[in-house]
Amino acid sequence: MLKPLGNRVIIKRVESEQTTKSGIVLTEKAKEKSNEGKVIAVGPGRLLDNGERVTPEVKEGDTVVFEQYAGSEVQVGEDKYLVISEEEVLAIVQ
């Protein structure tokens, strides 16, 4: 498993719908990548110049919305994850 460093967050994307509202089935190429996902792991937080750490606002298990082109995609086995900085998280879904 991946262990994020600093203010980074590991996210598993939530798959987007495979059919449109009108019933059209989308192929893998036609589907847009979702910018919503579940937080799998959270780093210890950003380190400040004075040596203190900023506690992350997100936690494991949160469903979040993040910037469209955020982070780097990483594959571990069959699973794909997104590694992003916490600043790229826009909101927590409640």
Curated annotation (Swiss-Prot):
Listed GO CC annotations: cytoplasm
Keywords: Chaperone, Cytoplasm
InterPro entries named in the record: Chaperonin_GroES, Chaperonin_GroES_sf, Chaprnonin_Cpn10_CS, GroES-like_sf
Job of this protein: Together with the chaperonin GroEL, plays an essential role in assisting protein folding. The GroEL-GroES system forms a nano-cage that allows encapsulation of the non-native substrate proteins and provides a physical environment optimized to promote and accelerate protein folding. GroES binds to the apical surface of the GroEL ring, thereby capping the opening of the GroEL channel.
Protein's organism: Staphylococcus carnosus (strain TM300)
Disulfide bonds listed in the record: none
Record's subcellular location: Cytoplasm
Record-given protein name: Co-chaperonin GroES
The family this protein is said to belong to: Belongs to the GroES chaperonin family.
Quaternary structure and partners: Heptamer of 7 subunits arranged in a ring. Interacts with the chaperonin GroEL.
CDD domains: cpn10
Keyword Cytoplasm tagged: yes
Gene Ontology MF terms: ATP binding; metal ion binding; protein folding chaperone; protein-folding chaperone binding; unfolded protein binding
Source species, domain of life: Bacteria
GO biological process: chaperone cofactor-dependent protein refolding
